[in-house]
Amino acid sequence: MPSHKSFMIKKKLGKKMRQNRPIPNWIRLRTDNKIRYNAKRRHWRRTKLGF
């Protein structure tokens, strides 16, 4: 990836970076909670973003 990114690409990368984190622990502690982990985690080497 070039070091000079367009602003739109940079914005998309930032969004994907924020999405790619584990769920907070307090969400796991809520009543009737069925979410155990973030099912949409993405590993930088296994799955590419495609842009």
Curated annotation (Swiss-Prot):
InterPro entries: Ribosomal_eL39 (IPR000077), Ribosomal_eL39_CS (IPR020083), Ribosomal_eL39_dom_sf (IPR023626). Residues 1-21 are annotated as: Disordered. GO terms for cellular component: cytosol; cytosolic large ribosomal subunit. GO terms for biological process: translation. The keyword Ribosomal protein applies. Residues 7-19 have a biased composition (Basic residues). Disulfide bonds: none annotated. SUPFAM superfamilies: Ribosomal protein L39e. It comes from the Eukaryota. PROSITE patterns: RIBOSOMAL_L39E. One of its GO terms (molecular function) is structural constituent of ribosome. Keywords: Ribonucleoprotein, Ribosomal protein. HAMAP family: Ribosomal_eL39. PANTHER family: LARGE RIBOSOMAL SUBUNIT PROTEIN EL39, RIBOSOMAL PROTEIN L39E. Belongs to the eukaryotic ribosomal protein eL39 family. This is Large ribosomal subunit protein eL39y. The gene is RPL39B.
